[in-house]
Amino acid sequence: MVKYTGQLNRYFKKDSIADIVSELPKPVMTLTDMFFPANRRVQKHSSLISLEDITAETGAVPLVRRGGHSVPVDPNSKTVQFIDLDGIIISRFFKANEVNDLIASGDTENVQAWVNENIENLRNRISDTTETLVRQALSGKIEYPYATDTGVAGKMEIDLGTPNALTAASIKTANIGDLQAWLEKTLSEHAKKAGSVSQPVFLLGSAVYSKVVSIVCAAQNAPVLWTAEGMKLFGKYDIRSLSMTYTLPGSNSPVDVIGANKMRIVDLANPGKLIYAALDDLDANLAPMPFYCKPQEMKDPDGIKLIASSKPLPAFAMKRQSEQTVTTA
């Protein structure tokens, strides 16, 4: 195989990857972008995440990992604990003859197009995995399958806590006036329990959202502004449908992000943080990156493996959220 070092590696430098990713079409990460815009994403320059950092966001020590460990250190007689976070590592393999033909052509544009296409494919898969983690984390607990070097499957278990429980409600026979009263009462109860109402959003399960829409549509001249995400009602209440699911690796069963008869209030001004830990990769300079990709020469069979990695942890502030069971029928 034509030696690729220096011929492909230059396309995979940190700055080159960052430039490629910045020019790619933005991946669809609906909940990740809703809860964790750029100012809520934090890069930690360590492969270990301090429990104190997460506790500051969530109000609770969050992690129990089956088969894993936390790492205690004792500087100046003060015990600090760190999470040894698992990362996302995926790859694509290319046979030697494919790479030979590509490099031997000497066409820089073809090589760059090949690099871009495969970086986009791997970037999208990591983005999809991050979105799945965020969707599952909204429940307050992550139980995500992972594989070890020996091929033994396990689970990364992260317990972020539970949202505040609100008094159950019924909108079974509600009219538009009852709907406003319910929203205001619910928001008031949330404020007392969560202490945060800067930018509240009502996230409704499928049955609740469908019922709210029917009530609004049945009312004449209801003060509603329809949006791409849902509706703004009475000029105050940001209401969105959360009829979404996620599917874990190895499963064919989709899981609802929230139940059909559930309502969740989240403060978009204080949802928590999406933390990226430093990668265990010297070629990446052990840096925290939402996405990194590099080529690795393989033998038996000969070829190149493109390896992509990321270490995300969606740390929701669960005590700033509230959940309610709503009867609709």
What is the predicted role of each segment?
Residues 33-34, 199-200, 226:
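Short glycine-rich, low-complexity/disordered patches
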Residues 1-46, 320-329:
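N-terminal alpha-helical "arm" segments
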Residues 83-159, 190-203, 302-308:
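Long, contiguous amphipathic alpha-helices that act as assembly "spine/axial" helices in icosahedral shell
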Residues 151-223:
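Extended, solvent-exposed, turn-rich assembly/linker loops in the middle of proteins
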Residues 32-101:
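Assembly/oligomerization interface modules of large self-assembling protein complexes
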Residues 8-18, 22-27, 137, 147-178:
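Hydrophobic alpha-helical segments and helix pairs
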Residues 144, 208-209, 312-313:
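Short, solvent-exposed loop/turn segments at secondary-structure junctions
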Residues 217-329:
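Sequence/fold signature of self-assembling virion shell proteins
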